[in-house]
Amino acid sequence: MALLQIAEPGQSAAPHQQKLAVGIDLGTTNSLVAAVRSGEASTLVDQQGRSILPSVVHYTSVSYTTGDEARANAQTDPKNTIISVKRLIGRSLSDIQQRYPSLPYQFEESDNGLPVIRTEQGNKNPIQVSSDILRALGQRAESTLGGELSGAVITVPAYFDDAQRAGTKDAAQLAGLHVLRLLNEPTAAAIAYGLDSGKEGVIAVYDLGGGTFDISILRLSKGVFEVLATGGDSALGGDDFDHLIAEHFQEQMGLSELTAEQNRILLDAATEAKIGLSEAESVNVEVLGWAGSLTREEFEDIIKPLVKKTLLSCRRALKDAEVDADDVLEVVMVGGSTRTLLVREMVGDFFGRTPLTSINPDEVVAIGASIQADILVGNKPDSEMLLLDVIPLSLGIETMGGLVEKIIPRNTTIPVARAQEFTTFKDGQTAMTVHTVQGEREMVDDCRSLARFALKGIPPMAAGAAHIRVTYQVDADGLLSVTAMEKSTGVQAEIQVKPSYGLSDNEVASMLKDSMTFAKEDMQARALAEQRVEADRVIEGLIAAMQADGDELLDEQEKQHLLQAIEALIEVRNGESADAIELEIKNTDKASQDFASRRMDKSIRAALSGQSVDNI
């Protein structure tokens, strides 16, 4: 693995000239851009002094506007005013229509299958709309910093899938931005607080924005953030606080119905009151001819059910991550709605520690991204040269049948950590060999073997019942650590290896070329191996079942029928046709269906034996 060294060119005419790089928080509701200047990370403002750019684009037949100017058209021209486009990135047209049926836009499906929105300026897909937002942020950055950008780190939600991440990257490239890295939003927030260089352990990132809530549970180990679990509510945010306050005002005013204009005015008043109560104990309200007040206590009573709802998501995320609230070292607050004192108080009580709130919660993600961007372009003193690398060949594990299951794909930026769960193949299996390989081929024999180790002490149980979590972690120096842990007992084993050791660039290129040359043959070999593994599972399972219950549940003719089915499957299994094996597996399953039903009935009778109706 060749390391790419990025540092100030010591022999250059301007040895201390800094490269211009930014961090961009491309948000659902709002977006920001930040940069490190004179060693300090801060957000960049527009000509009106605003750091926040609403994630809105308005199209006319000849031009487009972004931000506040675009949002002003939301009421009068909703079909051409695209809001919250981040929700649409990487989704199919049917998915969008199912998830967001009330959107005012006119959708079509393009030739390449991407959904497009009909506007006065023509059809626009979500990637193009996002690129217009990113272009505005890039132009702001270049104007403020006084030069051309070398690159940008763009943040994405931790739960974004490959299609959504690829769409975000495409949007940035369309906007003329060189993407240094896509960074998970919770990781960016943790970096902003310097947690990446702090003590190792579990970190919670609580992100309550205007329209969405996200909770992420991270583990920091050897400088690598691993996402343990994510959760949240895509339809819960600070906007919901505003709506509840507005409803309270409407009730106080005695109005049963409001016009759209009155509703907007009331919501603006609710937002203003909410912001005021972050500092004051009460605020006076004058709106639509009504004068009243709202105390912090009243406000907190109104929003408490929603805050409790976010804590339910936190509880689920902790359960998914298999950690307790007591295990969390730090809680990072993200999103403007976390300024609300009740939110900070209830989150602090839930996790048993004071949340980190010293950085502006609207800006913390962009600031963390800018710190990462500054590192990635090499803005370090000569004594702190940066090593930037990607994994040149996929890292995987051998599974039954000599197959390769890829854990970390090639071209993944390091440091990185990925985990996957596996199980046992045979009843009573108490050990498992973990064989780590490198390469792009489908079969172990065609890949490079890196290391083997055994995980022992697996409790004997039925095949498929054990849960073994295998974690691959590559640090900034390219050192791979492989850990296997049986989840019920916690027994684990680990090994470290340098995947790049002894591997030249020519060998890497040769391995990549082979993967393309033999792609068709490899997929055929994989399909055959998978069917053979499945056939072995069916054969072993059926033989074991007959040994256990055959004499009791089968007559002699039925036994012979099943034995013939097993023999037929064994014969085909040793052949070279994956389709033939698959067909014979189906025939064997069909032949044994009645036997399986009898075994199930026997198990149920045994389980219910001696039980009273009340107990059941």
Swiss-Prot record:
It comes from the Bacteria. CDD domains: ASKHA_NBD_HSP70_HscA. InterPro entries: ATPase_NBD, Heat_shock_70_CS, HscA_NBD, HSP70_C_sf, HSP70_peptide-bd_sf, Hsp_70_fam, ISC_FeS_clus_asmbl_HscA. Keywords: ATP-binding, Chaperone, Nucleotide-binding. GO terms for biological process: iron-sulfur cluster assembly. Signal peptide: none annotated. Chaperone involved in the maturation of iron-sulfur cluster-containing proteins. Has a low intrinsic ATPase activity which is markedly stimulated by HscB. This is Chaperone protein HscA homolog. It comes from Vibrio atlanticus (strain LGP32) (Vibrio splendidus (strain Mel32)).
